[in-house]
């Protein structure tokens, strides 16, 4: 997923809006049979980019979806990614009040893969 890698570079450079576009393009180009863990990683990174870009409600939904997917697959967030995740969660939780965050998180946890992709590309 070249676009996912480009998104990661943009995010690390502080170019959140550009990272969002790369991740959305990567999701739009998914094909049947793509690796579920790789797809989950793109959602995770897109959530971080959205949080950095100030799109907190959408970020909360996608981070919740990614967390549920990781849990379902038995995958733990790698230590190298934890600081990025915590930073995104701090931004999201700081921007949304508790009812907004709770609602967005519940929506994300309830998404299926198709709904998450559609919501990510169109949000």
Feature roles, as predicted:
Residues 1-4, 8, 41, 48, ...:
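Residue register of alpha-helical TPR repeats
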Residues 14, 24, 49-54:
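Extracellular beta-rich repeat passengers
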Residues 55-123:
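C-terminal non-catalytic interaction modules
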Residues 2, 19-26, 59-69:
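Tetratricopeptide repeat
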Residues 13-14, 28-38, 71-79:
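Short coil/turn linkers that connect adjacent helices within long alpha-helical scaffolds
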Residues 5, 12, 38, 45, ...:
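"A position-specific structural signal for the A-helix of alpha-solenoid helical repeats
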């Amino acid at each position: 997923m070249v676009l996912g890698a480009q998104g990661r570079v943009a995010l690390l450079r502080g170019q959140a809006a550009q990272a969002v576009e790369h991740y959305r393009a990567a999701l739009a180009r998914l094909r049947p049979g793509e690796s579920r863990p790789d797809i989950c990683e793109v959602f995770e990174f897109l959530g971080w980019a959205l949080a950095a870009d100030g799109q907190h409600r959408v970020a909360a939904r996608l981070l919740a979806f990614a967390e549920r997917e990781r849990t379902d697959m038995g995958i733990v967030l790698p230590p190298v990614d934890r600081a990025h995740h915590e930073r995104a969660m701090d931004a999201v939780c700081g921007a949304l009040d508790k009812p907004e965050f709770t609602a967005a998180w519940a929506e994300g946890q309830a998404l299926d893969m198709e709904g998450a992709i559609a919501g990510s590309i169109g949000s």
